[in-house]
Amino acid sequence: EKGYFCKKENGEYFVAGVWPGKVHFPDVLNKEAREWFGNKYQVLLDQGIEGFWNDMNEPSIFFAQDRMDETFDKIAELKDKNLDLDTFQQFTDLVGSLANNTDDFKKFYHNVDGKMMRHDKVHNLFGYNMTRAAGEAFERLSPEKRILMFSRSSYIGMHRYGGIWTGDNKSWWNHLLLNLRMMPSLNMVGILYTGADIGGFGADATEDLVMRWTQLAMFSPLMRNHSAMGTREQEVYRFDHIEEFRKIINIRYG
């Protein structure tokens, strides 16, 4: 009722699908909406939670409802047809283009000081302002504590409000090297609290890879082992050389 969600050009609310299904995106570039969103952390703070992880805040789009509706209509047209090669490729392209379609980021707008701004023009500021919403809220709601918060998406200047992790990596040796390269790059733009998913997020990790990654991560501010559903369980206690892992972790906390 207060217009705190992102809208389409015609004034209707933009509907997208992510983890919980259909959602609206909070317009965190709108100052009032940013404060409203930040205040939502109160219920979690009241439960004694002192660490937060802002994910999917590019924002990620599994599908835009308008594009999904168009896709279903086109699939219905193809249902009773004999799908030759070209038509079959059109069919697969329809479904394959649903997630994070660049055109969908041009379909919704932000209210920036009373001016409607198309999202793709300010894309990197969405994650930044979500981080800002949280950081400013923690100062208001819990001034006596320094609340831990890190984000997947953000922008230069976000170090005032929280940290960042390097996103969904893979359980590959070259992504271990990439972790080593990304951290100083982030440091050089002022982002100090950072780290990567130890062992890689996607694909199956080996014990050797997790051990080497843990050795690197003990020197990073954020030290977190994290993996995707459907991949090999990679908590360090699931491997054979538990004592070696214990020694590495003790160096950090000893």
What are these regions (language model features)?
Residues 1-254:
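Catalytic-domain carbohydrate-binding cleft regions of carbohydrate-active enzymes
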